[in-house]
Design a protein with these regions (language model features):
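Mid-domain alpha/beta scaffold segments of enzyme catalytic cores
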Residues: 1-308
């Protein structure tokens, strides 16, 4: 008998019961033609379909992160065409490495996959990022995601990431925008850079993955922790303990779709319409009613990103 094939299809649109009150997915990646591939690409759903499914279950607003230069313009178009959509723009730390001309193999063992657009130097890309942010203030609500990813890069790449991270911090402060931070295997280094340069007033640790030490830093500095599907994974006891120690008013929720779905959908594409599983898990963990948590999350989202 052949091994059972894992189901990689999209979870059904009615997989999650509608939430008791509206919430915002403050970090997702809506599909655009320039970024084809990844989970769900075999039978893709359009951005419009994903937004419609999300709204039907109470996820009424989303912030889509466009962190490769090839996705900026198409993501801005989505925000102007689809209800409830806004954009965060940045150069992802792993993209920054390629724009800096670094081609070293990182700790993950994967060879870097440079494409034609990576020939544009990092300093030129950062100039273009600032221009794009300024020109699209009507639909841009954050700078992100930027930060450090030591899982995917070596020593030379880490230097390029730090340079880019510091440039994003300065840009977010200059434009008075929130900063969404990508932090993978780099908790201490991220905190050191933020403390050295001075973090933006609204700093969000996207897909929070830290332990007690990072939670303490967030609480001390007033940085926001954005909670995603990994909170629900059985092995992540330290993550749950860290999140439990954070105050309610520093919590946001996200999917980071199409990656990292909540536990019962692991191995399948993630989407904003599945966010309810994470919200309900978080409510149970904190001993809060679902509606109360939703309203608290929405108020915090408004404090960080404004309303739309």
């Amino acid at each position: 008998m052949s091994p059972r094939k894992r189901d990689r299809s999209w979870p059904p649109a009615d997989a999650v019961v509608p939430l008791a009150a509206p919430v915002t997915d403050n970090h997702t990646h809506l599909p655009v033609p320039a970024d084809a591939g990844g989970p769900g690409s075999e039978a893709p759903l359009t951005a419009a379909e994903l937004v419609e499914c999300a709204a039907a279950v109470g996820v009424t607003r989303v912030v889509t992160s466009a962190c490769e230069v090839t996705t900026w313009e198409e993501s801005l178009t989505l925000a102007r065409e689809l209800p409830g959509v806004r954009v965060a723009l940045a150069v992802h730390p792993n993209e920054a490495v390629l724009h800096a001309g670094v081609r070293e193999t990182g700790p993950d063992g994967l060879e870097p996959r440079a494409q034609e657009h990576h020939g544009e130097p990092l300093d030129s890309v950062m100039v273009r990022l600032e221009e794009t942010l300024r020109a699209n203030a009507d639909v841009v609500v954050a700078v992100g995601e930027s930060g450090l990813d030591f899982f995917r890069t070596g020593e030379k790449g880490a230097a390029a990431q730090r340079e880019a991270f510091r440039a994003h911090i300065a840009l977010a402060k200059e434009l008075d925008l929130p900063l969404q931070i990508h932090d993978r295997d780099a908790h201490t280094a991220c905190v050191e850079v933020l403390e050295a340069d001075g973090a933006p007033e609204r700093t969000v640790l996207h897909c929070f993955s830290g332990g007690a030490e990072l939670a303490t830093a967030c609480a001390e500095h007033g940085w926001y922790a954005s909670i995603a599907g990994p909170l629900t994974y059985p092995a992540n006891t330290a993550l749950r303990e860290a999140v439990a120690a954070l105050p309610d008013d520093l919590l946001l929720v996200e999917t980071d779709a199409p990656y990292l779905p909540p536990r019962r959908w692991r191995g399948r594409p993630n989407a904003s319409y599945l966010l309810g599983d994470t919200v309900r898990f978080l409510a149970e963990q904190r001993g809060m009613g679902e509606e109360s948590l939703c309203r608290r999350l929405q108020a915090t989202t408004a404090a960080v990103y404004g309303t739309w």
